[in-house]
Curated annotation (Swiss-Prot):
Phylogenetic classification of the source organism: Bacteria, Bacillati, Bacillota, Bacilli, Bacillales
Organism: Staphylococcus aureus (strain bovine RF122 / ET3-1)
Segments passing through the bilayer: 1-21, 33-53, 78-98, 118-138, 167-187, 213-233, 241-261, 273-293, 300-320, 331-351, 387-407, 424-444, 472-492, 527-547, 595-615, 627-647, 651-671, 676-696, 712-732, 768-788
A molecular function GO annotation: antiporter activity
Record key words, sorted: Antiport, Cell membrane, Ion transport, Membrane, Transmembrane, Transmembrane helix, Transport
Protein name from the UniProt record: Putative antiporter subunit mnhA2
Gene Ontology CC, one term: plasma membrane
Amino acid sequence: MSLVYLLIAILVIMAMILLMSKRRALAKYAGYIALIAPVISSIYFMIQIPSVAKLQYLSTSIPWIKTLDINLDLRLDGLSLMFSLIISLIGIAVFFYATQYLSSRKDNLPRFYFYLTLFMFSMIGIVLSDNTILMYIFWELTSVSSFLLISYWYNNGDNQFGAIQSFMITVFGGLALLVGFIMLYIMTGTNNITDILGQADHIKNHGLFMPMIFMFLLGAFTKSAQFPFHIWLPRAMAAPTPVSAYLHSATMVKAGIFLLLRFTPLLGLSNMYIYIVTFVGLITMLFGSITALKQWDLKGILAYSTISQLGMIMVMVGIGGGYAQHQQDAIASIYTFVLFGALFHLMNHAIFKCALFMGVGILDHEAGSRDIRILSEMRQLFPKMNLVMTIAALSMAGVPFLNGFLSKEMFLDALTQTGQLSQFSLISMIAIVFVGVIASVFTFTYALYMVKEVFWTKYDSKVFTKKNIHEPWLFSLPSLILMVLVPVIFFVPNIFGKGIIVPALRAVSAGNHQIDQLAPHVSQWHGFNIPLLLTIIIILLGSVLAIKVDWKKVFTGKIRQISVSKSYEMVYRHFEKFATKRFKRVMQDRLNQYIIMTLGIFMVIIGYGYIRIGLPKVHQLHVSEFGPLEVILAIVTVTIGISLIFIRQRLTMVILNGVIGFVVTLLFIAMKAPDLALTQLVVETITTILFIVSFSRLPNVPRSNANKKREIIKISVSLLMALIVVSLIFITQQTDGLSSISDFYLKADKLTGGKNIVNAILGDFRALDTLFEGLVLIITGLGIYTLLNYQDRRGQDERE
């Protein structure tokens, strides 16, 4: 099955979900219909594992906009396969979990599952894209679908603010990324990613290389919640827990990392890129791990935990980027090891973090709270979630016999080897190791502290009242399956390493097959070495801090109020006030003012073009023959048009406006264009009647008195616009030896079977344009109808 067919299949499922929204009896099954999408994609991508391992990559290219080199280019290599498997397999768990989490009585299920499937479609589109513009389209689609999912419970103010904040930050990064893609096109002349990476040595010497890197980093850092753009992720936790488990731990937040990995053969040629990514990753890792201890909401803890873990992966992506410069050197094995660790931890993090979010969701759903100050001794009420969250949290902390331990060891090993790399000195290595270890200590602390507070703190009936709480098996099943994978991967890591991670490494290295020999063999025991010593230190210090310190009392008062998010809110409020003032100044409910502004901008653009290029010489001028009748009709049209400016009665204005149209009809007849005359007559008659009929539904608001200054502006704009239109007509008549498109229509109109060139153009040559013009009118009408029938939707949260 082609990659295009897979995407089409997902779109068909989305259409089925939309159809179910019209039938309440079927709406409750929307989740199970939506579940088909990740199941199909998972089966499809798992079937491709052997082929991709043998370098048999799938690719599809469908021309779209050839002149701009924008095509539907899709490519399935090792890197896109690994991410597609994560998106699809985690998707199965999340979609099934959502069927148990959401209520068919209280929630609009088809709407939710449509948004969730749209997001999955967008993420798969990102990782399969082999065209930069196509990737950007899918990139922004993830922002849109994320906005819709976060604001799913739209009556909640936190959901609305979180959705807007995440949308603004990620779209800002997306626009920066688009600028980077445009720079790449300027440097290479192509939008095809495979071709771009093949020109890496040429691009690195271009003047736009460094600006392009900064644009890429803005896109990646905003999407993957890196400091200081991390602030949207905690706010996004207002979304339903299935959304948090899928978007904000396993998939969407990994899109920025995917971007950097995909372009590592190009970006890694710059040492500045390596330094920035490594530094930002370390800061993010440290900041996230410390801030997680300040949270009382379990989802808040997991949000900052995700930020910290993403920073950890980003550090390895940054250090490993040097592989692009040293593919043939002896130290290439170190870079390969670091990149392998980044991919390995990316996979591990998706598993244990998704399990943690699901566990928190079950606690919230059944116990009614996520506050660690309220929840206590939950191991008795939720034995399965005690097991799931304990194992997943310990894996995140890097405890032995769990998958997180292996990738955490690789991370520490990578940090200790940076001193051997040309980009880092001994002092910088010590600083990197120090920050990495401190961040890891706090990671261990909040992971253990979270489990201790929720499941092992002594029960206090004054704080939390035990209710009829149950722990359904179907609800717990997805998290239990993910929990089982945590120790399984520890004992058989190389099954995943050789089948999934090594092919992904090939893609990161731009197809260098030597990387197969350089890829590490993951062992559970490496003997006593520096990374193991650092792990022991982390476990000891983290255990002491988690058990002996009451972090609920540490971060209080002013310390707790320090937040980067507050800076964002302050800037947001100022921009909002500024926009409100500008809006009130511009939007004064005067349609003619809006038209003047629109035409004014158009005239400025045309005028600027005339100034830059200059007016062409008019050496030929074609003017149709005209007689006294045409002159009289033209004078009548102009006279009525000018009189409309000074007339105050609405009905008179409408009638005179119709008269202008009928005079133009006579002008067409005089010019021997009967078809145009008939069309003009019909349109003018219908619009005039509609105008008059609409008066019965419009308020009787008298028109303001004539203002001499305002009327002069209107006349001036009209005359200037007429002058520009006439000048453009003259310019188009100067062929300069080039063939005109009119000649094509004149010669080819007989092929359409039409007897009139105008009909042939409207009905055949630009039939799609005519069709879409009609669709635009229909959509506009539906929009107006919706606004007229809009009722303020207020009420309680849909969960209640």
